[in-house]
UniProtKB/Swiss-Prot annotation:
NCBIfam families: PC_PLC. This is Hemolytic phospholipase C. GO terms for molecular function: lipase activity; phosphatidylcholine phospholipase C activity; sphingomyelin synthase activity; toxin activity. It comes from the Bacteria. PROSITE patterns: TAT. Its EC number is 3.1.4.3. Belongs to the bacterial phospholipase C family. It comes from Pseudomonas aeruginosa (strain ATCC 15692 / DSM 22644 / CIP 104116 / JCM 14847 / LMG 12228 / 1C / PRS 101 / PAO1). It catalyses: a 1,2-diacyl-sn-glycero-3-phosphocholine + H2O = phosphocholine + a 1,2-diacyl-sn-glycerol + H(+). Pfam families: Phosphoesterase, PLipase_C_C. Predicted to be exported by the Tat system. The position of the signal peptide cleavage has not been experimentally proven.
Length: 730
């Protein structure tokens, strides 16, 4: 044993005292969180190799906004740069006969713990997404899909987010239901080959070639671990049992007791032929198919026999799939965390990943980043092979956002990450730790989605003094018992108004943020002679210091305000050699002719990761005889922003740059530019922690000329969440 991992009484008491101050009552601080926070990592190499155990629990069917849209410091209900509908309203407002917006499911007065599942099939998710507009939620779902929880409703999960690291850009792998997403989680794809054919888009898993419905047949990641000699195991309370209606009429208390042995068919390995047909005494069967639950997990932890990789499959009543409520999941996660922290020596070397397979059709405001799926809807510098479902011609994913919390001694501090991830990111993390490659992950997905390593401070320099705000957090087991009976005497959470006058907002307060590998650009050039709009997108993320991956790709979404359809562009931060021999990467150019109306007017936005935003308005036809300021930025290593403006037009102009007052006390700046004259001015961003929002207007220009630039300047170092998240969206 080394000094680094020791369960220090002084540290334990310090965290407990901090939490008691925040909560007002020390008894409200869950013992499992106090124990987990009090253990410091076992630092031997200062790298990912210090991780000896990875434990993964994938829960069911909850979206990010549904659970964490109200949490402070995340890109939730106050997102200042959410997509807009074509009528100019933000996508918080969803139309279908009436207008709907997110509404609170108050578990103190309603039976919000007990709601029906929404439509979450392939066709439903794609209809909601609507080619990127994300505006058809109410055309597909019931109003209940707009419901969300607050801290008082899911206190333990908010406490986990306050204590450890939450991902605000973790996406389900497919715009589809549970089983295909779990296939991605366990094997890197949902098809026997990587060409987009025979993709499993439903839950039956029958591929028509084996003759046994519910069986799939390709190599899984656990099989690759076995071949490499890496120890792994599945923990589950029992197998799958049909959820027929009979149990609805048995004794109320015993209803969920009966479901404690039912894994709801969520052990994805049971769908694969090699596992389903394995002899009962075989290694595959013994590792993946046996019933061994949290009690056995705790025993293995205490006896120091926990495998290197563990997948946990929750029982039906604790998996959080509607109608089973979040309090049941909180209880189960508490048990898992209690088991993992019962031996401080083991916990000091363990990473616990809590994620969700898909969002069930519950509302999330962020559009899904996807590859271009046909001509005219974007471009990519990296191959999109295997990412377009052949029979429909639609993108497979990514899907909408779902929660992921990284719980470990290396990920303390209530931080948030805006790096883009999906279920294959979990496999990529295992790749980095154990050196076993998952060959099924597509090139596009490897480029766009990170490997989770940025969530962890393996040097141990993280702030271990941070205690979470645990106000009003009761014991999770008592909440679970109370939640069960609510279904019998509380009304359902009915939608409150068909003409919402306000949006829900978020808790106040910023949150520490982790560095992300993006340094993005979007500039517009008006080609007067050819009558074209030319968009240039750039990604300099590879040049960022401290980038744990060294490279990444970013998905830009071009969102037209009135004319044209959304487009998606994938731009790598590194060169990629194409089949033609051409080298693409770092920048990408395209013409946006379909975004011009008959009079030459254009109005569109460009969205990217971590709140990256550009907005362009003007009139191409009128620009020929006018001043024509073109605007770009240079990111400085010290976190400041250099704004570059050049007048390429025929007339002089007066350019006004107006900052968002939420970021700075500085007023507008004005510049006089002759034709072909340029200026470069630095904007200091220290007071806004690197966030900026600048609007550029000018005289003697095309009608309604506007260039708006917003986002965050990355330096490779941690920062703070967007200050505008403290201000209600409008």
């Amino acid at each position: 044993m080394t000094e680094n991992w020791k369960f220090r009484r002084r540290t334990f008491l310090k965290h407990g005292a901090q939490a008691a101050t925040l909560a007002g009552l020390s008894g409200l601080f869950p013992e499992t969180l106090r124990r987990a926070l009090a253990v410091e990592p076992d630092i031997r190499t200062g790298t990912i190799q210090d991780v000896q155990h990875v434990v993964i629990l994938m829960q069911e069917n909850r979206s990010f906004d549904h659970y964490f849209g109200h949490l402070n410091g995340v890109r939730g209900f106050n997102d200042p740069r959410a997509l807009k509908r074509q009528d100019g309203k933000p996508v918080w407002y969803q139309n279908y006969k009436y207008e709907f917006s997110p509404y609170h499911w108050d578990t103190k007065v309603t039976s919000a713990q007990w709601v029906s599942s929404q439509n979450h099939e392939w066709s439903a998710f794609h209809a909601i997404w609507n080619q990127g507009r994300n505006d058809k939620w109410m055309a597909v779902q019931y109003p209940e899909a707009m419901g969300y929880f607050k801290r008082g409703d899911i206190p333990y999960y908010y406490a986990l987010a306050d204590a450890f690291t939450l991902c605000e850009a973790y996406h389900q792998s497919m715009m589809g239901p549970t089983n295909p997403n779990r296939l991605y989680h366990m094997s890197g794809r949902a098809a026997p080959s990587g060409d987009g054919k025979d993709v499993h888009i439903g839950n039956d898993m029958g591929d028509g070639t084996i003759g046994a419905s519910g069986t799939v047949d390709w190599t899984t990641y656990p099989e690759r671990l076995s071949a490499a000699g890496v120890d792994w195991r599945v923990y589950q309370e029992g197998g799958y049992r049909s959820s027929s209606l009979w149990y609805l009429y048995v004794d109320a208390y015993w209803k969920y007791r009966l479901q404690e042995q039912n894994n709801y068919d969520c052990n994805a390995l049971a769908w694969f032929r090699n596992f389903k047909n394995a002899p009962r005494d075989s290694d595959l069967w013994q590792r993946a198919m046996l019933a061994r639950g949290v009690d056995q997990l705790r025993k293995d932890v205490q006896e120091n026999t926990l495998p290197q990789v563990s997948w946990i499959v929750a029982p039906y009543c604790y998996c959080e799939h509607p109608w089973w409520g979040p309090s049941f999941g909180e209880y189960y996660v508490t048990r898992v965390l209690e088991a993992l922290t019962s031996n401080p020596e083991v916990w000091a070397r363990t990473v616990f990943i809590l994620n969700y397979d898909e969002g069930d059709g519950f509302y999330d405001h962020a559009s899904a980043p996807v590859p271009p799926w046909k001509d005219g809807v974007g471009l990519s510098t990296v191959s999109t092979a295997g990412e377009i479902e052949v029979s429909s011609g639609l993108p497979i994913g990514l899907g909408h956002r779902v929660p992921l919390i990284a719980i470990s001694p290396w990920s303390k501090g209530g931080k948030v990450s805006a790096e883009v991830f999906d279920h294959t990111s979990v496999l990529r993390f295992l790749e980095r730790r154990f050196g076993v490659v998952e060959e099924n992950i597509s090139p596009w997905r490897r480029a766009v989605c990170g490997d989770l390593t940025s969530l962890f401070d393996f040097q141990g320099a993280g702030d271990t003094q941070v205690a979470p705000d645990l106000t009003n957090v009761p014991q999770s087991d008592a909440r679970k018992e109370d939640a069960y009976w609510q279904q019998f005497y509380r009304p359902s959470p009915k939608y409150w108004s068909y003409e919402p006058k306000s949006l829900p907002g978020q808790e106040k307060g910023q949150r520490p943020t982790l560095a992300v590998p993006y340094q993005l650009h979007a500039t517009l050039a008006l080609d007067i002679a050819a009558g074209k709009l030319r968009l240039t997108l750039g990604n300099d993320g590879m040049s960022l210091p401290g980038n744990p991956q060294g490279h990444s790709a970013a998905v830009f979404q071009v969102q037209p305000r009135e004319v044209g359809n959304p487009r998606f562009y994938t731009v790598t931060s590194y060169p990629v050699v194409q089949e033609s021999g051409e080298e693409l990467g770092r920048t990408l150019n395209d013409e946006l002719d379909d975004l011009l109306d008959a009079n030459g007017r254009y109005a569109f936005e460009v969205h990217g990761p971590n709140g990256f935003f550009r907005e362009f308005h003007g009139n191409l036809h009128l620009a020929a005889q006018m001043a024509r300021p073109e605007v770009s930025v240079t990111y400085q290593r010290n976190g400041n922003l250099q704004l570059n403006i050049r007048n390429l037009g025929r007339l002089p102009c007066s350019v006004t740059v107006t900052p968002n007052p939420a970021y700075t006390r500085e007023g507008s700046r004005r510049y006089e530019l002759e034709p072909n004259q340029a200026i470069s001015e630095v904007w200091l961003l220290r007071s806004s922690q690197g966030w900026y929002d600048l609007s550029v207007t000018a005289s003697n220009t095309e009608a309604n000329y506007l260039r708006r630039l917003a986002g965050h300047v990355e330096t490779g170092k941690p920062s703070r969440s967007d200050p505008l998240l403290d201000i209600a969206a409008t």
